[in-house]
Amino acid sequence: MSNHYYTKNPETESKEASWTFPLRGREFRFISDSGVFSKKTVDFGSRLLIETFRLNEEVAGDILDVGCGYGPMGLALAYAYPARLVEMVDVNERAMSLARRNAEANNIRNVKVYES
């Protein structure tokens, strides 16, 4: 059976890496690893969504990041909208752990990470 980034518990050998990346006017520090989506950088599609997302302030409620991976989209939106809770879900246990660690490393508290 092959491993994919949507595998619950990747068997791929862990090879963590960290880097910084600017999103929405802030320099974020990310930790990523083998077995997660776009492990070496924030991919073009995610960057585009992050930079163009605009929240309708008239609509109440939380923000949901489905397939959060190591967290770049959810964390950038949590930073941009600190009054909102960002709920982040993923099937990949390694990715969820990284998302939690990245939230802590970037001092972002208005997020919760769940298994989907």
What residue spans do the PLM features occupy?
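Well-ordered beta-strand scaffold positions
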Residues: R26-F28
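Short glycine/serine/threonine-biased micro-segments
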Residues: L23, D33, D43, D65-G69
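Conserved SAM-binding loop and adjacent beta-strand
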Residues: D33-E51
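Conserved SAM/SAH cofactor-binding pocket of Class I
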Residues: S46-S116
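Residue-level signal for pocket-adjacent positions within structured domains
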Residues: E16, I31-S32, V113
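Generic, low-specificity signal for short hydrophobic/alpha-helical stretches with a mild N-terminal bias
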Residues: N3, I31-S32, V59
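Short, flexible coil/turn micro-motifs enriched in small/turn-prone residues
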Residues: T20, F30, K40, D62-L64
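N-terminal auxiliary segments of SAM/dcSAM-dependent transferases
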Residues: M1-R24, G35
